[in-house]
């Protein structure tokens, strides 16, 4: 059963960001659906995607001189640190904590997309395509 649905509410109209967000939803749902035996490996795949996703956003924000970069990056860092700690504890047998993370992340993600990422994509659109090209270079 999905814990989060990719929907218009999460759609920002920015192709790269929307693709990352759709993958985030798909992978988080895979963690939610994973058996206990497969939970940690599904969480590993989710964390690996999220590391790349957040690093990409961080690079875009830095290249575009996004004013609240540090606040946005700190939120990314905190969520990744939490996911890594929960992964460690789930690998040690604390599946209840792992399952709790999966049920609580969707609310955080929806708020993050609506506030933080919406501001970021608006800023990037105003700065033009060069901001992302600089980040990719």
UniProtKB/Swiss-Prot annotation:
**InterPro entries xrefs:** Bacteriohemerythrin-like, Haemerythrin_Fe_BS, Hemerythrin, Hemerythrin-like, Hemerythrin-like_sf, Hemerythrin_metal-bd
The record, for CDD domains, names: Hemerythrin
Keyword hit for Metal-binding: yes
Query: Which GO MF terms does the UniProt record name?
Result: iron ion binding; oxygen carrier activity
Coiled-coil ranges from the UniProt annotation: none
An example of a Pfam family matching this protein is Hemerythrin
* Highest taxon of the lineage: Bacteria
User: Which residues are involved in binding Fe cation 1?
Assistant: 21, 53, 57, 117
Keywords (alphabetical) are: Iron, Metal-binding, Oxygen transport, Transport
Q: Which residues bind Fe cation 2?
A: 57, 72, 76, 112, 117
Function, as annotated: Oxygen-binding protein. May be involved in a storage mechanism or for delivery to oxygen-requiring enzymes. The oxygen-binding site contains two iron atoms.
Q: Subunit structure, per the record?
A: Monomer.
Q: Which NCBIfam families does the record cross-reference, listed alphabetically?
A: hemeryth_dom, PRK01917.1
The family note in this entry says:
Belongs to the hemerythrin family.
The protein's name: Bacteriohemerythrin
Organismal lineage: Bacteria, Pseudomonadati, Pseudomonadota, Betaproteobacteria, Burkholderiales
């Amino acid at each position: 059963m999905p814990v989060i649905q990719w929907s218009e509410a999460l759609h920002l109209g920015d192709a790269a960001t929307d693709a990352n967000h759709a993958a985030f939803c798909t992978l988080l749902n895979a963690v939610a659906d994973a058996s206990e035996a497969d939970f940690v490996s599904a969480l590993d795949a989710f964390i690996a995607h999220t590391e790349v996703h957040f690093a990409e956003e961080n690079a875009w924000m830095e290249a575009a001189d996004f004013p609240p970069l540090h606040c946005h990056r700190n939120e990314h860092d905190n969520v990744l640190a939490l996911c890594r700690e929960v992964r460690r504890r789930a690998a040690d047998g604390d599946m209840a904590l792992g399952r709790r993370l999966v049920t609580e992340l969707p609310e955080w993600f929806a708020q993050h997309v609506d506030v933080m990422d919406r501001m970021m994509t608006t800023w990037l659109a105003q700065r033009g395509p060069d901001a992302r090209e600089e980040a990719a270079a």
